[in-house]
């Protein structure tokens, strides 16, 4: 869930993140979004 393009669609982000819960997200520069992530089997949203 790191280095995603900023402004990525929520659906694609859910697919990309799979079972990761991402917090403290911020954009670095104009291209990448950095997140702190942790694994969770309950992250099915």
UniProtKB/Swiss-Prot annotation:
The keyword Cell membrane does not apply. Keywords: Ion channel impairing toxin, Neurotoxin, Potassium channel impairing toxin, Secreted, Toxin. It is found in: Secreted. GO terms for molecular function: potassium channel regulator activity; toxin activity. It comes from the Eukaryota. One of its GO terms (cellular component) is extracellular region. Expressed by the venom gland. Inhibits potassium channels. This is Putative potassium channel blocker.
């Amino acid at each position: 869930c790191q280095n995603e393009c900023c402004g990525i669609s929520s659906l694609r982000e859910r697919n990309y993140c799979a079972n990761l819960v991402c917090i403290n997200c911020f954009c670095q520069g104009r291209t990448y979004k950095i997140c702190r992530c942790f694994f969770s089997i309950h992250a099915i949203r």
